[in-house]
């Protein structure tokens, strides 16, 4: 019996060992990842120091581009270790530690290699970058009270320094400062601060700072539906052409929203399509969803029907569901279904800031219905039109048809005496200017794309040409080469 019990218990021992080993392996992998994160951010600090010394902002730009990856590695042990390595003991380190929580009670402090404490304070650029990392970490933890205080301290550091090497980090800091104010529903309080920083950035030719601040101000105005002020800002300021693609995409989206609210649908559609093209195609799914919703509504307002493949994209299919139903209602000219879509999805349309534009679509639904009626019937009475559109009286139908004829929606004539609408024969679209205008639009886009590509290329500095010889020097050198060749030929002849 004893031997059988021992035999039965024997296979269980290796399982326990495997579980313990797997737990130890996971703990070791976690420590390695944290150590690598510390080393990576330390390397970022060295890159920033190199940029300050060499006056080359591209090193800082490279560090900031990796911010989305870095923010996922900001564990508690990582930021505490970095604070010790970057800041010497004193009030400065204590101020930084105020934004980093202590280890949980009863939890054992992770055993990373003992960090080498800093001897002197970091340069302002490294200080601002680490402060920015702390602010991003607090936002990810949804600790708004600490994030607000951290953001204010970061702005004090940025404003207090007059260094061009700090411009790129300052631009990123402005964005997160505005984000904190938005989460606190207090965007109005920072508007004057953003305006003052925009004036300073413009005077200093800080192009990235200008782009970020203009976008923050536009978002600030649009949050409160201040379209007139936003339009004035766009007209009075110049968005820098050298701004990053992400900032250009944001600016074009805000510009599209402003133009759509101002009834300039063609311009709005052009800006929104450019925003979609400039946005990252694989990442930034939320931004693409937001822009695509507005593009669909603007296309419907222009009288166009979006293609079905737009709604079939995997990343957009679910979010564009209500807009697909809206498109179907407009395409069929069904007023009843249009009203049902507004009732069912009105709250979502308000959250997407498209409800006001969608209300304007009622006229387009009626126009589409009248156009389809005009194509289907060569002659129809106002009573039948009123019944098909669900209108109250034939007089309303007659008024709507007359307005549609005046606007060029349909080619027809009204005969009040006989009481019917007679449709004219449809003309061939290729005999009009429509194809010419469509080709012109495509050619203009290709030319603009070519010009932007040429501007985005990097060229050698002008000093490169100074080392090249002039035409006169080249002629003298060629003459000397010819004389030398003749002398060598004569020497060869003498040798024979």
UniProtKB/Swiss-Prot annotation:
InterPro entries: 26S_Psome_reg_C, CSN3, PCI_dom, WH_DNA-bd_sf. Signal peptide: none annotated. Residues 249-428 form the PCI domain. It comes from the Eukaryota. Residues 464-480 have a biased composition (Basic and acidic residues). Keywords: Proteasome. GO terms for cellular component: proteasome regulatory particle, lid subcomplex. Residues 458-480 are annotated as: Disordered. GO terms for molecular function: enzyme regulator activity. One of its GO terms (biological process) is regulation of protein catabolic process. Pfam families: PCI, Rpn3_C. SMART domains: PAM, PINT. Acts as a regulatory subunit of the 26 proteasome which is involved in the ATP-dependent degradation of ubiquitinated proteins. The 26S proteasome is composed of a core protease, known as the 20S proteasome, capped at one or both ends by the 19S regulatory complex (RC). The RC is composed of at least 18 different subunits in two subcomplexes, the base and the lid, which form the portions proximal and distal to the 20S proteolytic core, respectively. Belongs to the proteasome subunit S3 family. This is Probable 26S proteasome non-ATPase regulatory subunit 3. The gene is Dox-A2.
